[in-house]
Amino acid sequence: MGTPLEDVTGRMPDVEIRQEAGILAPASRVQVLLALTGIILPVLALSMEEGFAISAVPRAVASLNGFNRYAWPSTSFLLTSTVAMPVFAKLSDLYGRKWFYLFSVVSSIAYPLLCGSAGTLPIPLDGMNQIILAAGFLGLAHGGIMVLSFTLVADLFPPSERGRYQGILAAVTTLPFTIGPSLGGWITDHWSWRWAFYVNVPLGVMAIAVVYFALPGTRRRLARSSIDWAGIATLLGWLVPLLLALTWVGQSSWSAPRIRALLIASAVLLPIFLLVEKYAVEPIVLLTLFRNRRITLVSLNIFLMGIGLYGISVYLPLDLQGVVGASAAKSGAVFGLYAFSVVAANLVSGRLLSRAARNQFLAIGGSGLTATGLFLLSRMDSSTTQPEILLCAILSGVGFGVLMPTYEVLVQNAAPAEAMGVATGVTQFLRSVGGAIGLALFSTMLLRIYHSHVDHLIPKGAPAPLRQAFDNPLQLAFNRPHLASAVSQIANGESLLRNLFQGSRAGFLSAMHFIFLISAAALAASCVLNLFLGGTPSQKGPRRPL
């Protein structure tokens, strides 16, 4: 027999949004706990999929002979996730969160199913293109789940309690990355890379059921409910060419015709997008939000945070293996401790946000800690030890863990209730754009700095395997036995190989200096901007019976 909160179908009933407060009402303790479970479980399932993929995707790419398209899954993910965030945010403001959240969770199930079956599906795509397609579904799911989960928390709790639960949600987002890569690697090694994807399907199915039955629906009472299709089209029109150009420039140059064409298309369509949004009835990006000085400053900070966050997340393992010479297992352990520091800081800062007199101080402290940790990473050299790198990474992780829920709460407390979804979507959107731009810059500079140290060391007429091996530095550790055989017939071959490996390490070190220094500069600029946030007290509001 169901509780009074359930309808005859066993589902939680629809509830109305109190526009003046932005919270779900009415809500008992049971309903709030069930709704919170419905919010958190999809985030956990999604993060587990992404954590396992860190170890499984490289093996899948090798198995499917797709190394020449190695970057395309990441590109597909960034494209769909970045575009999905503002679109889902706006549509959820118009028609309610639940069904768009459920659609996002269903999309997340497509990823492990498609990846696990890649190369065997009866569709007109080869195995690698099936992985790329699956990454697009993952990006769609990521964009929807990330923006809607944080918005649902803002709907469910008053401003005075949001910080605590935003911190919990941010921790759930990060926690699987402390164990996911190592567990996914173990499954890949002992079973197969396909099972590293399939193992996540049951949790995803459970998440679908919990969202459907436990998460309340919302009935929006809006005088108008038009969809900004022109805004969606022009958003895709300027953003997709920009991200493609930033992704491909590392493989060519800024003067390449296709890069120029993409950048010109993006530059032409961006002002058209802004013009469309200015006059749209229900815009995807509510430009009037940026009349609020605090939202504008926090949005800039989130963009800068995205540069540093993606920089350390992608290049810390490469730094450990390429510069310090750590094994993959030790590199994974360091990354896991870094991720754990983010989780711990999420939880602590979430509670502090509910008690702090001025959240501005948390933003200043978090950006300052992160900038310091990244700057120290930029000063390392070949004698730097793994514990020293770990200490710097943890310092950065604590800073990021403080910033994530702090920025979310600052924006949500400043935004009107009817624009809560759009405001939250803008923050997630800008973080992804910052990360995409940062990674494109870092990828380009990594290759250029690396080759400036290595190319002049390779003699003319060198065996093709030698030249090809050093054109692909990420595979050097695996190719070293074959390279020794390749240079055995060259005069001073052993000395040449030793010099090449030294040059490769020096190139990596110089590139890491650049990457972490730019990341530190972005967070230092963010710290300065945080000084101008002004008084940002933790707002009070009606409390939930928790």
Walk through the language-model features, giving the residues of each.
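Hydrophobic transmembrane-helix bundles of small-molecule transporters
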Residues: 186-301, 308, 326, 334, ...
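Transmembrane core module of solute transporters
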Residues: 35-84, 192, 230, 257-259, ...
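Transmembrane alpha-helical cores of Major Facilitator Superfamily
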Residues: 44, 75-79, 106, 167-175, ...
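Helix-loop-helix hairpins in multi-pass membrane proteins, especially solute transporters
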Residues: 85-231, 257
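Interfacial helix-cap and linker-helix signal at transmembrane-aqueous boundaries
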Residues: 60-61, 91-92, 183-191, 246, ...
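C-terminal module of multi-pass small-molecule transporters
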Residues: 84, 89, 96-107, 128-130, ...
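Transmembrane-helix exit segments and adjacent C-terminal regions of multi-pass membrane proteins
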Residues: 2-35, 39, 43, 473-546
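A membrane-interface helix-boundary motif in multi-pass transporters
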Residues: 189-201, 248-259, 448-520
